[in-house]
From Swiss-Prot:
Taxonomic lineage of the native organism: Bacteria, Bacillati, Mycoplasmatota, Mollicutes, Mycoplasmataceae
Name of the encoding gene: rplA
Species whose genome carries this gene: Mycoplasma capricolum subsp. capricolum (strain California kid / ATCC 27343 / NCTC 10154)
Name of the featured protein: Large ribosomal subunit protein uL1
Gene Ontology BP terms: regulation of translation; translation
Purpose of the protein: Binds directly to 23S rRNA. The L1 stalk is quite mobile in the ribosome, and is involved in E site tRNA release.
Quaternary organization: Part of the 50S ribosomal subunit.
Amino acid sequence: MAKISKRFKEALSKVEKNKVYPLNKALDLAKQTATTKFDSTVEVAFNLNIDPRKADQQIRGAVVLPAGTGKTQRVLVLTNTKTKEAEQAKADIVGGEELINRIKNENWFDFDIIVATPEMMAKLGAIGKILGPKGLMPNPKTGTVTMDVAKAVDDIKKGKVEYRADKEGNIHLIIGKVSFEAEKLEENFKAVIDEIRRVKPQTVKGDYIKNITLSTTMGPGIKVEF
């Protein structure tokens, strides 16, 4: 069993195990229990009453956080048709098949996210096994396969985050950094929970959201009222 650090034990002692906290108190506790020396990420985890084995209950998408993520994303746009629009939108890197070959042949990953126009997808499919495990494969559901590359790049730069339910029905999303003002974290949390409610599958019966947990990088989980 992994050894629990003294710092984590101290953080854990501040959180009542089975208590469900109001959002403002949960955010305050998350800041107090951040155990890292760097500016920790604040994450929210939704445990949903879904069965991801069913096609109509596989949840995936993206949401723009109104207060941003606190992280700068390097955006690669792959296109043969929207180069000018991508450059004007201030994409970090813009190119076509030559960049796909660079990823394939040079193991090049100087970017955080890929936006592609539809005509590039057949070529991208050839390196799907490289991009997929890294979570870098563009997907229409997350808005990263699109002809409107300007909007896609703008949304990412503003603070768009992607989400996907795992096989246990959990969705993990970042809502900012510990250094954010509580109001900004609250704003992002509300945007995220609104999005999760919006994508509720019609076939779900009973309670949709089972519980919500807030945490920081390497910090304890804090149950949140909803």
